Amino acid sequence: MECKRARAYSSSANLGSGFDILSMAHTAFFDTVEICVETKNSENIVIESNSKIPLEPNRNSATYPLVRIMEERGIKASLRVKVIKGIPEGLGLGSSGASATAAVMAFSSLFNLNLSKEDLVRYAMYGEIASSGSPHPDNVAASVFGGVVSVVSVNPVKVVEIPLNYSFNILLFVPLNVHIEEKTKKAREMVPKTVKLSDYINNSRYISSLLIGFVKGERDLIRLGLNDEIVEKARLPLFPYYPKIKEIAIKYDAVGSCVSGAGPSILVLTDKMTDENKIAEEGTKTCNEFNVECEVIKAKIAGGVEVERRN
Ligand SMILES: Nc1ncnc2c1ncn2[C@@H]1O[C@H](COP(=O)(O)OP(=O)(O)O)[C@@H](O)[C@H]1O
Ligand SMILES: N[C@@H](CCOP(=O)(O)O)C(=O)O
């Protein structure tokens, strides 16, 4: 029985005002997906996992993309799909997107499809439909490409890798005792259907500032760019500790801070001027004030999805 295994890293999407556009892959966690072909004479998908994720193929973000690829390309096979979760689910770390990305990469390798990175994103987006009901491209784009990415088009998929000319590290406040059923789906329902022009203009200024800050290596532009007047504010009930953690991050000279994806994790970018220990100490105290136990994870920018070489 032939098998292929791929690894995809966690991600923090949105990055302030880049809702459904920007995302950053990081080394905090990773998912691994192994796909084995049992036979090509029948069609079936059996899922195994170390975590409590749906085991129905159309409801699992790793396997729904495979269903769609096989339909689209007329591939007939019975698969055994092992989803080894390293990324905690439902915490704003791109867990569903990473599973989808690793699965599509492993499948592409197994069937010699040589899918382009854009095609990997296109198919992995089906995984986000399984997990949140919406094909948001940002998490999967970061898990596919690595680094910081901007999804400039979804039909067709076009992803731009953002050159990073500022060296930073990553702190993530991960609230491990928080569980929100179908979190991203619920968070997306909280996004307003209409926005004030002034908020739109400010958010456009922020996203411009963030991208220019990354490219030109300007710390103050990155800090300014990690703000959002619309989506984070609408979702604040999901992470009420966020404003104070952001205040603490700036107090101890972080580069900047924003919500990680749809939350409830919080992302802090740091550099040599930052007192990371004080941020971690006072930030976890803030979580506790809201009856939340935050674990502080240190990470760096991660690379893109990879097929694991089997020894
Ligand atoms: N392979 C998978 N990995 C993680 N979550 C999955 C997977 N398949 C389905 N899900 C479901 O998707 C939801 C987690 O995805 P989501 O809400 O987007 O949060 P996040 O991407 O921040 O982990 C959970 O309800 C989980 O049961
Ligand atoms: N743009 C999406 C990103 C969701 O990221 P996740 O890691 O929380 O799944 C959104 O904000 O809905």
Curated annotation (Swiss-Prot):
Name the principal localization, coarsely classed. Answer: cytoplasm
Signal peptide start-end: none
Keyword tags: Amino-acid biosynthesis, ATP-binding, Cytoplasm, Kinase, Nucleotide-binding, Threonine biosynthesis, Transferase
| SUPFAM superfamilies recorded | GHMP Kinase, C-terminal domain, Ribosomal protein S5 domain 2-like
Q: Which PROSITE patterns match?
A: GHMP_KINASES_ATP
Where along the chain is ATP bound? 88-98
Q: What is its EC number?
A: 2.7.1.39
Gene3D superfamilies listed in its UniProt record: 3.30.230.10, GHMP kinase, C-terminal domain (3.30.70.890)
Pfam families, alphabetized: GHMP_kinases_C, GHMP_kinases_N
Pathway assigned to this chain's UniProt record: Amino-acid biosynthesis; L-threonine biosynthesis; L-threonine from L-aspartate: step 4/5
Enzyme type, top EC level: transferase
Q: Which GO terms describe its biological process?
A: threonine biosynthetic process
Question: Is Lyase among this UniProt entry's keywords?
Answer: no
Question: Which superkingdom heads the taxonomic lineage of this protein's source?
Answer: Archaea
The terms under GO molecular function for this entry are: ATP binding; homoserine kinase activity
| Coiled-coil stretches | none
Catalysed reaction per UniProt? L-homoserine + ATP = O-phospho-L-homoserine + ADP + H(+)
Q: Which HAMAP family match?
A: Homoser_kinase
By sequence similarity, the record places it as follows: Belongs to the GHMP kinase family. Homoserine kinase subfamily.
* Protein name per its UniProtKB record: Homoserine kinase
Species name? Saccharolobus islandicus (strain L.S.2.15 / Lassen #1) (Sulfolobus islandicus)
Q: Which gene encodes it?
A: thrB
